[in-house]
Each structure stands twice: as structure tokens, then as C-alpha cells.
Amino acid sequence: MFKATARYIRVQPRKARLAAGLMRNLSVQEAEEQLGFSQLKAGRCLKKVLNSAVANAELHENIKRENLSVTEVRVDAGPVYKRSKSKSRGGRSPILKRTSHLTVIVGEKER
């Protein structure tokens, strides 16, 4: 099992979970293809994290890329940046800029 994380990514967790669903329980090649065709911003971020996890596997255990599959994908909510927008009659409305923590774990395919 090899893990890679990206923290404090400026992507809403709800939207990132949609992209994470595309790559669950797939081989690394299939997951990369799925994320490559995805037009979501989170897809680009998850592809980078996936490549990092694969690089960890290749570097530390000398496992070939073809023998790896996505074991777990986790998207957790990070801190929320709070901004405000002025409204009529002296009021304001909050604008919440959400962040995500992305975790991808890859492991060897079960034979």
C-alpha cells in the first residue's frame, strides 16, 4: 500500500468526491484515462496525487505501474475561507471558499 496526499486544495469537497468516484477500484492506467477525460478541476488534482502515489510505489518497492490498482480514494473537507459580499441596506452575505484534503492509496492488483 502506497499513499500520497494533497492538502488544502481549493476545490469543494462535494465536487471532488464526484471525481474520486470515477477512479475507485480501477487499475492505475484506467484511472488515469478516466481522470484525463474528466473536465472537473478536482480530476486534474487527483491525477497528480495518483501519479505521486505510483511514483512512491516505484521508488520504494520497485513495483511496476502495470501491477498497481487504486485501493482507496478519500476526499476530506479542509478549512473554509470566509469572505463576505456587501448587500443592500448595509447587510452582507457570507461567501464560503471550501478546501479539500485528497488522499490516494494504491496497492498491488490481486491475482
From Swiss-Prot:
A Pfam family the protein falls into: Ribosomal_L22
GO biological process: translation
Annotated GO CC locations: cytosolic large ribosomal subunit
Signal peptide span: none
Swiss-Prot/TrEMBL keywords: Ribonucleoprotein, Ribosomal protein, RNA-binding, rRNA-binding
Keyword rRNA-binding: yes
Recorded superkingdom: Bacteria
GO molecular function ontology, one term from the record: structural constituent of ribosome
ATP-binding as UniProt keyword: no
Family: Belongs to the universal ribosomal protein uL22 family.
General function of this protein: This protein binds specifically to 23S rRNA; its binding is stimulated by other ribosomal proteins, e.g. L4, L17, and L20. It is important during the early stages of 50S assembly. It makes multiple contacts with different domains of the 23S rRNA in the assembled 50S subunit and ribosome.
Cross-referenced PANTHER family: CHLOROPLAST 50S RIBOSOMAL PROTEIN L22-RELATED, LARGE RIBOSOMAL SUBUNIT PROTEIN UL22M
Assembly with partners or alone: Part of the 50S ribosomal subunit.
Name of the protein described by the UniProt record: Large ribosomal subunit protein uL22
UniProt gene name: rplV
